[in-house]
Amino acid sequence: MGSDLLWLILAIVVGTYVVLFGFLRRANEWYYSMKLGDKSRYLPPGDMGWPIIGNMIPYFKGFRSGEPESFIFDLFEKYGRKGIYRNHIFGSPSIIVLAPEACRQVFLDDDNFKMGYPESTNKLTFRGSFNTASKEGQRRIRKLATSPIRGHKAIAIYIDNIEDIVVKSMNEWASKDKPIEFLSEMRKATFKVIANIFLGSSSESVIGSVEQYYVDYANGLISPLAINLPGFAFHKAMKARDMLGEILEPILRERRSMKEKDQLKGKRGLVDLLMEVEDENGEKLEDVDIVDMLIAFLSAGHESSAHIATWAIIHLHRHPEMLQKARKEQEEIVKKRPASQQGFSIEDFKQMEYIAQVIDETLRITNLSSSSFREAEADVNLQGYIIPKGWKVLLYNRGVHRNPENYPNPKEFDPSRWDNRANRPGYFIPFGGGPRICPGADLAKLEMSIFIHYFLLNYRLEPLNPECPTEYLPVPRPSDQCLARIVKLK
């Protein structure tokens, strides 16, 4: 009798677990199916995951296990290779897009799609009124604010500043009698560059203060859930964001005062331009909006340059024949310089054809930003599927760049794959695409090129752990920050 009762209790427990598990596992699907009604029949294939957390566990599991593509290849296996899938990720019902033509369509459709960052990013970055301005007003402000960093002519004025910081930083690294964390030092150097360009300041105290809080801020940008409680990365990031505002707002007041007293004397930064920009009603941006933009620019500007330049140098040193080819190109560029030319020039930058391929291949294989984010402002038809109004769209860079159908042997570092490669919209999207493509792409590539140029000409990387594993969160990086000796070439 006792044994029968035990089995009955066990059966009830197991049965209850199975029923509850099955119900909870399908709850999101049922909820959105009822909410959308007949439209749900036209959603792409996929899985809405668990209530609240959606599919964040398998998404981050791949990154933590060192196989970030596993999430996407699991979608391929379950739902076919169409490249458009429904999902629930970063707290929102979403459509994941990794078909190049579909990516191109979304990027170009600025009328039906707006920026659609996760809630954590929005709360950390956009605290002012810029996001509530009209779409036309946003376009105008964005165009005016980013004009100083678009195109070769505009970015040429920053070369001397970048070159000075690069040369001094590398001399300092090579002079140390112990190994350095190469990536960490690159981040410090690129932060100096971006702070100088955007804030118009080379003050070590200002740069140090901003960088101190920036790290915690950046770690919370893609928090799975925006939980503002002690112990969560998002909470720490919110506190860091508050401190960044407290540091930057006095800089705005100081720059405004310097302008009124005519004390800038050519030392203008992007911050000065932002203080002059007016919206469609003739209203100037509030300080909180300017701080929002400065933090966004600082984030995008220094992270991409530091990591991609570091990875490019690492990959080249892992492939001696590529390193030799890249170094020879830099030596030939120096030989061709006019006798009157001192230092790097925009013409040198234009001649760096192989380094441009190295940078593009590093962008492709590294995927510093895994996704571009949009939000549908109306029901949109995308290759026969519906994207419901209000749903997020993740244009999954990593899924495009690591798909063997788009790039044969995608895990191999091979700059030659860019030889005479035709421009195929939607296939290469490290900076996004369409009207909202990253405005700092030109400046970032210039900065990376100058770092790589001077490093290859004068230094050699000697990693202490050549087989060091890669960590993928929050961004791909060597787990030891590329602990290495920087050796000056004779």
UniProtKB/Swiss-Prot annotation:
Amino-acid positions noted as binding heme in the UniProt annotation, renumbered to this chain: 438
Catalytic reaction(s) noted: (21S)-21-acetoxyl-apo-melianone + reduced [NADPH--hemoprotein reductase] + O2 = (21S)-21-acetyl-1-hydroxy-apo-melianone + oxidized [NADPH--hemoprotein reductase] + H2O + H(+)
Pathway: Secondary metabolite biosynthesis; terpenoid biosynthesis
GO biological process terms on file: brassinosteroid biosynthetic process; brassinosteroid homeostasis; sterol metabolic process
Transmembrane stretches, start-end: 4-24
The keyword Phosphoprotein is assigned to this record: no
UniProt GO cellular component terms: endoplasmic reticulum; membrane
EC assignment: 1.14.14.-
Enzyme superclass (EC): oxidoreductase
Superkingdom classification of source: Eukaryota
Bilayer topology term: Single-pass membrane protein
InterPro entries in the record: Cyt_P450, Cyt_P450_CS, Cyt_P450_E_grp-I, Cyt_P450_sf
Task performed by this protein: Monooxygenase involved in the biosynthesis of limonoids triterpene natural products such as azadirachtin, an antifeedant widely used as bioinsecticide, and possessing many medicinal applications including anti-tumoral, anti-malarial, anti-rheumatic, antibacterial, anti-inflammatory, anti-pyretic and diuretic effects. Catalyzes the conversion of (21S)-21-acetoxyl-apo-melianone to (21S)-21-acetyl-1-hydroxy-apo-melianone.
PANTHER family: CYTOCHROME P450 26, CYTOCHROME P450 88D6
Family stated for the protein in its record: Belongs to the cytochrome P450 family.
The protein's name: (21S)-21-acetyl-1-hydroxy-apo-melianone synthase CYP88A164
Gene: CYP88A164
